[in-house]
Amino acid sequence: SVTAEDGVYRSRAEVDGAVYDAMSNLGRNPSVGGTARRLETHIFGFSGALYGRMLRVELLEKIRDERRFDTLEELRTQIEKDREYILKLK
């Protein structure tokens, strides 16, 4: 269950007992017209399929609020800035 507020987070993900640094977005994805609340996580240094596997995500630190971007390019640019910032924190 998720009780955190919407936003972008520095996070940690556990897959099959291995722990990875990660970046997560909790919210409704307003830039792409999303309405359902969901958690999306990018796991740094992980490659492979996760479909059908159990995974644990821990939200460690909120980086910023979720917001709507006018273009997908603006969204991509912000995601890269968030990624760089989070990697500097670890």
Region spans (language model):
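Phosphate/ribose-recognition catalytic cores of enzymes acting on nucleotide-derived substrates
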Residues: 1-90
